[in-house]
Amino acid sequence: NCHNKINRAQLNAEEIEKEMAAISKTGLQEILILTGESRNKSTVEYIGEACKIARKYFKVIGLEIYPVNSDEYTYLHECGADYVTVFQETYNSDKYETLHLAGHKRIYPYRVNAQERALQGGMRGVGFGALLGLDDFRKDAFATGYHAYLLQRKYPHAEIAFSCPR
């Protein structure tokens, strides 16, 4: 995807406010803010501003963003974010490296440790997901569960969620 030519839209603060207001009128009380993997297109500050706007309308704010450091997760939590989901894709580090040839996403340990940094940054919950099919799905399913289990033991207050691949 690092060479993907698809045009993408990015909302400004006014557009974010308008969308959040419209979505909240449907009765939803939780919102998920998604970005791509580009820090240049969606900076941590931009995501933080979106969280501040969302907090006016929603009780719970989730993020599906690129992995960031603990201080950045703290900032996002202070802006209103409650939980973070990171898709590991596969827990086979050798296979993972063959799938991500360039960019920050290539750094397996940084990505696999994102949920722990989010909890260190004050998030109340984290989500896990493997794509199940890039490697042996049984191994990835087990690794996803074990990853969550280890963090639940270390952070017993944490809310843990699993996302299934589409």
What are these language model-derived features?
Residues 40-41, 70, 135-138:
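Loop/helix-junction capping segments adjacent to catalytic residues or to phosphate/diphosphate-binding pockets
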Residues 12, 43, 104-107, 137-141:
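Residue-level preference for long, well-ordered alpha-helices that form the structural scaffold
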Residues 3-4, 32-44:
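Glycine-rich, proline-tolerant flexible connector loops at the mouths of alpha/beta enzymes
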Residues 35, 88-90, 166:
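Short, small-residue-rich loop/turn micro-motifs
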Residues 17, 21, 25-31, 42-130:
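Radical SAM/AdoMet-radical enzyme domain recognition
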Residues 109-166:
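Conserved C-terminal portion of the radical SAM core fold
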Residues 1-15:
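Canonical Radical SAM [4Fe-4S] cluster-binding loop centered on the CxxxCxxC motif
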